[in-house]
Design a protein with these regions (language model features):
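A glycine-rich phosphate-binding loop feature that marks nucleotide/adenosyl-phosphate handling sites
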Residues: 33, 67-73, 162-166
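Generic structural concept
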Residues: 43, 47, 79, 83, ...
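Single conserved hydrophobic/aromatic residue that forms the stacking wall/gate
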Residues: 1-11
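A conserved active-site cap/scaffold subdomain adjacent to cofactor or substrate pockets
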Residues: 12-59, 66
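Basic, alpha-helical terminal appendages of large translation-related enzymes
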Residues: 27, 91, 96, 106, ...
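Conserved, charged catalytic cores of large soluble enzymes
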Residues: 28, 50-89, 109, 113-128
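Extended, non-catalytic structural segments that build the interaction scaffolds
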Residues: 28-42, 84-103
């Protein structure tokens, strides 16, 4: 890898290398692929999801984790996938199949963004229970995905978990199976942008 800009190896680069190179094998990597990967997976999918949901929750849920919720089928379908896949995830980690691990996280991020878009909580302001439930579900998904991302990008995940006043000691893989881990009524904190897009060089 010969970067256009000289810089030290950082956490974002590690994420890219783990995604692109199978353990023990060679990989085809490039600066362009790195930039596309970071911009797509981390800046657009993970970082943008966090910012969108937080901003909506602060504006429409008094800046708190919603208390009155009632899960519907769409909510449980996406929430339960994490617990349903827990043993498979553990197995892939134990066998150092980190490509699968990253792919699972990326697919989960796509599903999370699709869930929030499809549910359209901004159109549910006359149904506060439904609005609250969508927001709570989205926050739980962010929490679950953050727990999964922690071994790969720990520093960035700890920044994201400040949303919920959670820290390193709160992160346990088995807790991705819990659908009501977050404490209802607790305050939600604003966070800085997690990942700035990498601007491509034109030279």
């Amino acid at each position: 890898l010969r970067p256009r800009r000289q810089r030290q190896m950082c956490i974002r680069d590690r994420y890219y290398l783990i995604k692109e190179v199978s353990f023990g094998n060679d990989g085809n990597i490039s600066q362009d692929k790195l930039e596309d990967c970071i911009n797509s997976d981390l800046a657009n999918n993970y970082g943008n999801l966090c910012q969108r949901v937080i901003a909506f929750a602060i504006k429409n849920c008094d800046g708190k984790i919603p208390e009155k919720i009632k899960f519907e089928e769409d909510d449980l379908n996406i929430l339960n996938k994490f617990g349903d896949n827990l043993e498979n995830i553990r197995s892939k980690i134990d066998h150092q199949n980190l490509n699968f691990y990253i792919d699972y996280i990326v697919n989960s991020l796509f599903e999370a963004n699709k869930y929030f878009n499809d549910q359209e909580p901004w159109k549910k302001k006359d149904d506060i229970i439904r609005l609250n439930t969508i927001v709570f579900t989205a926050l739980e998904i962010i929490r679950k995905i953050s727990f999964l991302l922690y071994p790969i990008i720990p520093g960035s995940v700890l920044k994201a978990l400040k949303i919920f006043n959670l820290g390193e000691n709160d992160i346990k893989l088995e807790d991705i199976s819990k659908n009501e881990f977050l404490i209802k009524g607790n305050s939600i904190n604003k966070i800085d942008i997690l990942f700035k897009k990498i601007e491509k060089d034109n030279d």
